[in-house]
Amino acid sequence: MNEKNIKHSQNFITSKHNIDKIMTNIRLNEHDNIFEIGSGKGHFTLELVQRCNFVTAIEIDHKLCKTTENKLVDHDNFQVLNKDILQFKFPKNQSYKIFGNIPYNISTDIIRKIVFDSIADEIYLIVEYGFAKRLLNTKRSLALFLMAEVDISILSMVPREYFHPKPRVNSSLIRLNRKKSRISHKDKQKYNYFVMKWVNKEYKKIFTKNQFNNSLKHAGIDDLNNISFEQFLSLFNSYKLFNK
């Protein structure tokens, strides 16, 4: 990944007042271990170390790593790793949560990484508002892949005025809560295929006409442009039955 591109995409929140307003929506306690994606200048990191057991900040910009370390000089329950989050290997044998004010231009890559390559039980991210809405849109493949693994909530708006430099759009604080996967391991490949055919409206490649009509009826779907994730799972289960 190009480090320069990432650095140029960063927008910081530095006002303690605004940070405190955001932190009120994040469930943390003194036993939590946190991985922070992008420490920036350490403003959120400072709040995290005061609330949690231990914070590991992952920051690709070595200058910002030093800035964060200097800001937290009075604390010892943290480490700052000068690493690319997309190459980072999350631990598989401990409990932790994730927080990050993530760059807009790699939001999809980051969210895929932390949902599918980490075991974090709770994930809090500040993302562009339009991106947050897309994560709840069952017409999009990313949403359908994520909803099988996590429950997604938009917790609050984060106005663009909170940031510097000020972006063109507002952001949101979102929470992803880990749940038992709705797709069994043996069905993962089949689910991936079904999702891509569905979002591309290639219905004839996954159902006959009669199968399609019966599946829609069984799922209680009247409008293909407005279906819930549970209805989508019903369609997938019908597809599996027809393709044993």
UniProtKB/Swiss-Prot annotation:
GO terms for molecular function: 23S rRNA (adenine(2085)-N(6))-dimethyltransferase activity; RNA binding; rRNA (adenine-N6,N6-)-dimethyltransferase activity. It comes from the Bacteria. Gene3D superfamilies: Ribosomal RNA adenine dimethylase-like, domain 2, Vaccinia Virus protein VP39. InterPro entries: KsgA/Erm (IPR001737), rRNA_Ade_diMease-like_C (IPR023165), rRNA_Ade_Mease_Trfase_CS (IPR020596), rRNA_Ade_methylase_Trfase_N (IPR020598), SAM-dependent_MTases_sf (IPR029063). Belongs to the class I-like SAM-binding methyltransferase superfamily. rRNA adenine N(6)-methyltransferase family. This protein produces a dimethylation of the adenine residue at position 2085 in 23S rRNA, resulting in reduced affinity between ribosomes and macrolide-lincosamide-streptogramin B antibiotics. This is rRNA adenine N-6-methyltransferase. It comes from Staphylococcus aureus. The lineage of its organism: Bacteria, Bacillati, Bacillota, Bacilli, Bacillales.
